[in-house]
Each structure stands twice: as structure tokens, then as C-alpha cells.
């Protein structure tokens, strides 16, 4: 009976312990990788989720009070803690909404006959009287910190250059007003009791000697053809830049152009429904028209046939006619209250009704929102009601992220990414489609360039090249992968892009001449006598091919201008421009070449290993049965290695999709939806790298960048999973070879 020696039993036990430890370590590593991927996914989702949460409106406080006089307007400070009310006697009252007390009041004018205000970002009010005069007032708040406490001090300031302006020389009572007023200019328009439309333009001129501003009031001359029914005028507004005046009648909307103290009628639009009132949307690039049937439509200028026209873009319908409306100060949101007491929060650009609920049983007299849009202040017959509004990301929806949106100033709906701009009234545009398109565009052109070269090189190196030459070629190509992509991107942007621009015909010609010349050289080599072919060792054909390709490249770059003169009138870029094809110096062609050079080592290494690893008995058996080398390659070797070759291409695609520095430095980084190889793009990865440092933590922009990262993560995961599934299928299919 045989017994194991003690030292052998010890070694078996030791081996068992090592196997157990390694098994646990391998399993733990696999589970850890999966857990890490899931944590990344969950973290991205946690940052993204708030942009798709529902809007909430919660009651915050109430202050019961009744006012004997009609309310003309209400407003508040930036945080919605103190409000003001202007009544038809010309008095303004300031109310502390926290302590529910009257803070102060001031008489601005006695019994005004007309009233208006500028957009909320200007905070100017105008009062008309029975003598044809207009008086201005600016209402605001001063913040004072006393002993660590924040105190709001109400302010009412007059327009110092003009205590009042005589708009009507005939001293007729004013019935309607429209106002636009800034620090350097302004326009006041008024209708009179005798049915006239009058206007005064306010201009400030700086005295070069004293540096003081001198204001002038200049009457505006109106074209009389459009002023035949002022008695039926319902509403009028002026844009803050003093360029346009909108007049609303029951079934007509007029657009007037103001220039050089003159006003002429630009266009008149017939309205099918009966209109009520005009309101400027935030930024004053759009005008909102209220209708008697409870609908609200947005209009803005578009250019059609090189002519600017006011166009109805979108319409919102409500359950009852609108009684109060308040646009947000900095966003395209609007608070709407109808006759039934329903509150609706809408975002005009995304065409979303964010919130709709019945909240009011009493008549609503006025509504306003502070600049931060975090509160809603409503004045009813019974007093003040304040609501907390949670609506941090109204501009984001599935449609705005993945669909076409019609933005102000654009002729039609489009996919647009533009997160920031220099002006305050800019509207962020967060469509990810241009970035996703740019990502796929860059990856596509990179694979078009790198795929044939890398796979062809892998086939030749693994199957045809001699082992002595392969020993030097393969490590040389593989070491290219260690080259930093920032260096490749720098060379592409600074060195390669100008070369391509100055030799565009030569570059395109080489894409045809190189493959054609290789086939011609191969054909000539094939028909040469056998004794000549035997002089060159097997697998060293590149010794002849490389000088030939270098010579063709030299001739093409030096004499490509002849082709350009013959076919393209001497300038290919100008010729393409005449055909409507744009050209950017840093374009997809440059990116394709540069990124292709970066992913060639990845594709080559995996594909070459797959081809070289095909069992020798398969190829030798095929050759022994009479097949040629080419037949053996195409019918045996490539089929067996196809799973590895496919994996190589997918790895190259994943590398191209996630590449950042090359795209960042070799393109113009313009988010375009254009497949033109001669124009640039912006990719998801490059966009994250560019904009993440400048985004505010927790802002819509910040979360949209995380959404872009999540899409990149999902796309890469999907491509890799699909590649693995196809690879396994190919492996099972050709296992029997």
C-alpha cells in the first residue's frame, strides 16, 4: 500500500491553499470591477436625475389684507422677502412678507391716468397724467448689514434728467403708455384721449469737456398709414434696445421699426383669434400674445427669403382665459393664472407645461416672481400669498436634449449645443445630438483611415512577412501606442492641418494613388520572371514598395497643383465653396488621419496576434491540399482569426469614441450636425474636457455634462458588449475549422 511522503502532503496542502487564495482573489477582482462600473453608473445617474425631476409649488406664507384702490403692479426684491404694490392713486406701498407688515409707502404721482413698466430687469415705471405729461420712477431695494443682520431698505428714485416729460403738447390726458429706459437712452410712447399715438426718444450725450451726460427729449415722427384705429388699441410694448414697437389690436398685430427718431410700419399681421394683451418674454426677443380663448402664443423674428418677419412659433392652451401672467427675469419660463384659479408654469422654448394645479379661489389681482424664480408672489382680493417654487432645470427635457428645438433668432427648429455666451439675455441650448454626431463622425473617419491600414499590416506581418523582419516591425508599431495623444493632437493641429490645407488636392489624390500604385506594383511583381523574384527573400517585399510609395507621395505633393489647375480652376477650396461645401482648417480629415495614427497600434496588435495564433496545422493542411497562399489566407486563416480581428476593430472604435486630446487640439470644436469631412466637429469627450472647468457645481450646465459622460459610458459599454457577443458567435461558428 502506497503512502504519500510527508513533504509531498505538505506541498499538496500548500498548493491547495494557494489555489484557494488565487480563486478568491480572481473572483473578488471580477466582482470589484463590476461593482466599480456599477458605482460609476449610479453616481452619474445620481448627478443627472435632478434635471428630470418634477416641479413643485408649496405654500410658504399668507398675509391677509384688503386694498381699497385698484392694483396696477406688484414686485419684490431678489429673494422674495419684501414686496411692493403700486395702486391707481399713484402710491407705492412696501410690505414685509416675512413679518407681514407694511414697511413704508410713498406717493409718486397724484391720480395717474396711464401706467406702464419696463421689463423687470430695468425696474422703471412710467405714470401719465391728465395734462399729457409722463413721470418716471424706479423702485428697488438697498441691502444694509447692521450687526450681522441683513436689512432691506425700500428705494423710490425719480428720473433725474427729467422730473417729467411733456409728451402731448396739447395737454390731452394720456390713456396708455409703453416704456423702455436704460442708463443711456429710452423711449416713451403714449396714446391720448383724442386717439393719437405720440412718442419721445430720450438720448444722452456725453460732454467731452466736463464728462457729464446731457439728456435730450426728441419727438418721434410716426408714419400715419398704420395709425387709423388707435382707439381700438389693446396693448403696446417696446423692446429694451428701443428698436421695435409692437401694437396689438383685437385681430391685428403691428410691428414698427424705430430708427433716427422716426417710426415706420414694418409689417401688419392678421390674427385669427381675438387677442387680449402683449407681454415681452425674458430677453425681449419674443413677444407673448394672450387670446380670449385661453391660449398664449409666442412670436419672434425669423429670416425668410432674406426678409425679417414676425413668426408665430408655438402656442399653449389653458382651461380658461388668462387673467395674470408673469415671465421670469432670466429664463424663458412664464407663470400663468387663468380665470378658474389654475396656476400653470410653462417653459416656452421646450414647450413644456411644467406644473398645473388649481390653487386660487379668490380673484387674482397681480402676480410676480423674484429674479431667482424660487418664489411666486400673488396678490388676491384677500391679500398676499407666497409660494416656494422648486424649478431648477426648466430648460431640460427629453425633447430639448435629443430633439430639434426652435430657438429665438433661428429660421427653423435645429439641434444646437451652446451652453454659454457673453450677454445676460442668452438662452442656453443643451442638445446633445451635435456632440453625439461629432463623436461618431470622428470615430468613423478615424476607422476609415486606420482600419484598412492596421488590418492589412496585421495580415502581412503575421502571414507573409519573414520572422526576422517581423521581429523588428511588430514591436516598432506597438511602441507607437505609447506616444502621448496630446503630442499627436498638437502635431495635427499645428503641423498637419496647414499641410492638408495647402495641399488638399495632393492629400485626396494619395488616397487613390497609394492603393492603385500598390496594386500595379503587385501586378508587375507577379508577371516578373521567377529568377528575378527569387532574388528578393520571401516576406521582404516592403523593401521595394516603400521607396515606390515615397516617390509617388513626393511627385503628388510637388505636382498636385497641375491637377488642381486642370480640374478645379486652380483652387480646390474656392471651387468647393462655390458648390456650397465649407472648409475649416482643422477638420474631420485631419482628425481622421491623426486619430487613425493613434488607434492603428491598438487594432494592429490585437489583429496580428489573432492571425498569428491561428494553428499552423490549419494553414499547412490547406496548402497540402493544393490551395494557394491567398486561398488559405481568405478561406482558413482570416475566418479562424475573425473573432480577434473584429475585437481589434471594436477596441479601436472604443478608443476613438473616448479620445479627447486629439479632437480637442485638431478640430475647431464647433458642435455641427454636418457629415462634411472638410468641416470640424465637437465630441462628447472633448466637450466635457472644455466646459467642465467653467461649469457651476449643481447647475444645469454641470449636470448636462454628466449626462454627456453617461451617454459616453453607455455607448462604450454597449459597443463592447455587442462586440463580445458577435465575437463569441464568430468563435462558435468557426470553431470546427
What are these model-predicted stretches?
Residues 520-530, 608, 612, 616, ...:
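C-terminal transmembrane helix and the adjacent membrane-cytosol boundary/short C-terminal tail
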Residues 59-65, 101-107, 162-169, 215-228, ...:
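A short beta-strand motif characteristic of beta-propeller blades
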Residues 68-76, 110-123, 162-180, 226-240, ...:
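Repeated scaffold domains used in trafficking and secretory/extracellular systems
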Residues 429-443, 497-516, 535-602:
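Loop-to-helix entry region at the N-terminal start of transmembrane alpha-helices
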Amino acid at each position: 500500500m502506497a503512502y504519500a511522503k510527508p513533504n509531498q502532503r505538505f506541498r499538496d496542502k500548500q498548493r491547495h491553499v494557494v489555489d484557494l487564495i488565487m480563486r478568491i482573489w480572481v473572483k473578488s477582482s471580477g466582482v470589484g470591477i463590476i461593482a466599480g462600473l456599477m458605482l460609476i453608473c449610479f453616481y452619474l445617474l445620481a448627478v443627472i436625475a435632478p434635471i428630470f425631476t418634477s416641479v413643485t409649488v408649496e405654500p410658504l406664507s399668507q398675509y391677509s389684507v384688503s386694498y381699497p384702490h385698484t392694483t396696477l403692479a406688484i414686485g419684490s426684491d431678489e429673494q422674495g422677502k419684501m414686496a411692493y404694490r403700486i395702486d391707481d392713486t399713484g402710491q407705492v406701498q412696501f410690505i414685509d412678507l416675512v413679518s407681514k407688515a407694511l414697511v413704508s409707502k410713498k406717493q409718486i404721482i397724484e391720480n395717474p391716468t396711464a401706467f406702464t413698466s419696463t421689463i423687470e430687469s430695468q425696474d422703471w415705471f412710467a405714470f401719465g397724467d391728465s395734462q399729457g405729461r409722463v413721470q418716471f420712477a424706479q423702485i428697488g431695494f438697498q441691502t444694509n448689514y447692521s450687526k450681522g443682520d441683513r436689512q432691506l431698505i425700500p428705494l423710490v428714485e425719480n428720473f433725474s434728467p427729467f422730473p417729467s416729460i411733456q409728451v402731448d403738447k396739447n395737454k390731452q390726458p394720456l390713456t396708455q403708455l409703453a416704456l423702455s429706459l436704460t442708463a443711456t437712452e429710452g423711449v416713451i410712447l403714449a396714446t391720448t384721449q383724442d386717439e393719437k399715438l405720440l412718442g419721445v426718444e430720450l438720448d444722452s450725450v456725453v460732454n467731452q469737456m466736463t464728462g457729464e451726460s446731457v439728456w435730450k427729449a426728441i419727438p418721434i415722427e410716426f408714419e400715419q398709414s398704420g395709425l387709423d384705429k388707435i382707439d381700438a388699441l389693446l396693448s403696446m410694448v417696446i423692446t429694451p434696445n428701443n428698436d421695435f414697437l409692437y401694437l396689438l389690436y383685437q385681430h391685428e398685430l403691428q410691428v414698427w421699426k424705430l430708427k433716427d427718431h422716426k417710426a415706420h410700419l414694418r409689417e401688419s399681421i392678421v390674427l385669427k383669434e381675438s387677442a387680449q394683451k402683449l407681454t415681452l418674454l425674458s430677453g425681449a426677443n419674443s413677444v407673448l400674445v394672450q387670446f380670449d380663448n385661453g391660449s398664449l402664443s409666442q412670436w419672434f423674428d425669423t429670416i425668410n427669403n432674406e426678409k425679417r418677419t414676425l413668426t408665430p412659433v408655438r402656442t399653449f392652451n389653458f382651461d380658461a382665459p388668462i387673467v395674470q401672467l408673469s415671465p421670469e427675469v432670466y429664463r424663458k419660463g412664464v407663470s400663468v393664472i387663468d380665470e378658474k384659479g389654475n396656476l400653470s408654469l410653462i417653459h416656452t422654448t421646450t414647450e413644456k407645461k411644467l406644473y398645473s394645479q388649481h390653487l386660487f379661489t379668490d380673484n387674482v389681482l397681480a402676480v410676480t416672481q423674484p429674479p431667482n424664480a424660487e418664489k411666486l408672489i400673488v396678490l388676491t382680493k384677500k391679500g398676499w400669498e407666497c409660494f416656494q417654487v422648486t424649478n431648477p432645470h426648466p430648460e431640460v427635457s427629453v425633447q430639448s436634449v435629443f430633439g430639434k428645438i426652435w430657438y429665438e433668432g433661428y429660421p427653423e427648429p435645429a439641434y444646437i449645443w451652446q451652453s454659454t455666451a457673453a450677454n445676460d439675455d442668452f438662452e442656453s441650448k443643451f442638445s446633445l445630438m451635435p456632440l453625439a454626431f461629432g463623436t461618431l463622425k470622428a470615430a468613423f473617419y478615424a476607422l476609415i483611415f486606420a482600419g484598412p491600414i492596421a488590418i492589412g499590416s496585421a495580415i502581412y506581418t503575421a502571414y507573409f512577412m519573414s520572422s526576422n523582419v517581423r521581429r523588428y516591425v511588430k514591436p516598432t508599431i506597438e511602441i507607437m501606442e505609447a506616444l502621448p495623444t496630446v503630442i499627436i493632437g498638437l502635431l495635427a493641429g499645428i503641423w498637419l492641418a496647414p499641410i492638408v490645407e495647402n495641399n488638399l488636392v495632393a492629400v485626396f489624390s494619395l488616397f487613390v494613388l497609394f492603393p492603385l500604385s500598390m496594386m500595379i506594383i503587385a501586378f508587375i511583381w507577379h508577371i516578373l520572371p521567377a529568377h528575378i523574384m527569387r532574388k528578393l527573400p520571401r516576406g521582404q517585399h516592403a523593401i521595394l514598395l516603400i521607396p515606390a510609395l515615397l516617390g509617388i507621395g513626393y511627385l503628388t505633393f510637388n505636382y498636385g497643383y497641375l491637377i488642381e489647375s486642370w480640374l478645379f480652376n486652380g483652387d480646390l477650396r474656392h471651387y468647393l465653396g462655390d458648390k456650397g461645401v465649407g472648409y475649416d482648417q482643422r477638420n474631420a480629415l485631419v482628425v481622421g488621419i491623426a486619430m487613425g495614427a493613434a488607434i492603428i497600434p491598438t487594432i494592429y496588435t490585437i489583429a496580428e496576434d489573432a492571425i498569428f495564433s491561428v494553428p499552423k496545422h490549419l494553414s499547412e493542411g490547406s496548402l497540402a491540399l493544393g490551395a494557394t497562399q491567398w486561398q488559405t489566407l481568405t478561406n482558413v486563416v482570416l475566418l479562424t482569426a475573425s473573432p480577434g480581428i473584429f475585437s481589434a476593430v471594436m477596441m479601436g472604435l472604443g478608443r476613438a469614441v473616448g479620445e479627447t486630446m486629439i479632437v480637442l487640439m485638431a478640430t475647431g470644436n464647433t458642435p455641427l450636425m454636418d457629415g462634411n469631412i472638410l468641416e470640424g466637429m465637437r465630441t462628447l469627450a472633448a466637450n466635457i474636457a472644455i466646459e467642465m472647468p467653467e461649469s457651476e457645481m449643481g447647475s444645469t450646465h454641470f449636470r448636462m455634462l454628466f449626462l454627456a459622460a453617461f451617454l459616453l459610458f453607455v455607448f462604450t459599454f454597449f459597443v463592447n458588449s455587442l462586440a463580445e457577443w458577435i465575437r463569441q458567435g464568430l468563435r462558435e461558428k468557426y470553431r470546427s475549422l
